[in-house]
Amino acid sequence: LMIYQFIYSLLNQAILLPITADTQDTALTIFSTLNDRGLPLSDADIFKAKIYNHLEGKDKEIFIERWKELDEQATAANESIQQLFYYYMFYLRALEKDTKSTTPGVRKYYSSNKFARLYQSELLDNLFVMIELWKVINKGEVLEDESWSSNIKIKQTLDTLTSYPNEFWKYPVIIYYICYRKDKNFEDKFARFLNKLLAELMTKYILIPTINAVKGDILKLNSAIVVSDIPKFDFKELDQAQLEAGIQNPHRNVVRMLLKTLAYKHQDSLLPSKWEIEHIFPQKWQTNYFIDESDNKIREKIEHIGNKLPFEKKLNIIAGNGYFAKKKKEYAASKIEITKVMGLSEIQEWNLESISKRDIRISDSIIAILKKWNKEYSVITKEIVSNKPSDEDLARIAEFKEKGWI
């Protein structure tokens, strides 16, 4: 009965109002305005319509099929077409040497110059290329004929970068991959580049924990990448003397990066997908445990890096807020090497002095890792420079050309 009432109402009470528009832009504007209470058009929807109407004949059918495949692959890689266009904007800005700190809106950026950037023949191909990268980062997939995707050290560095507090790490990684993925020595150079990027970003955030601290540096790096596969990291100099203290008592947003960096030094596998930051000395303690120390000092010390471990969520729930001797059994069962070693150690008591000693060990270890990465990157930079002809060599080449010898 209800269905007949609906049909009657639709035929006799609904009003069909035709709306015509002189251009597609006008039609899209009208649709967005009338549809504000429904599901609004995304930038990707508008870009799809623009590209489709720019094509002719069978190219339209091919485009629709490729767009559908792009959407499916992006979703499977935990990304979206909307996000891919945003990432790609930074690649195009790098090609255009645009290092302005103000990030334009995606729709505004692509709509400039009559949507010319959308009509570039390589657009869809490069969006598919980006998805390949995210398949590795987000899903842990191994790509056919791309050996770097099974390189555990590269995957560990990428995993550590995913814990960076904002998305600025993504843009140079994407640009580097698009530009050089087919090069002969890509795997080695990509590994060193990623380590160098992580070293710069982590160091900067430890000392200046704000989003804008690296924005300008990253934009300059993006432009440098499209010119060279050994780009110069023109990051501002930092006070290295403050780094040790910053590692020992880090901002909460950088703790996961530090723990991953430390953990990956000691194992050749990724951390489990679900792990938590474990406080060795519990956040809730008995007030009579430290009679001579103020609660504020204890609370501050508990948050030091020396009191923290990466720990599987299930084991962490079992360990609870128990004291060290009681939690060692769960630590020993961990598949995270540095946590397991702590559980198998002969240490029976954990106190503020223990935290201070481990603070020093961890900061020394992290600083050593950062120095190693910087040195490895500088080595390939020097190799490139040493392989270039000197002024004397160039003069000889010019002389030989003039004489017709070459």
Model-derived segments and their meaning:
Residues 1-406:
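Flexible coil/loop and intrinsically disordered segments
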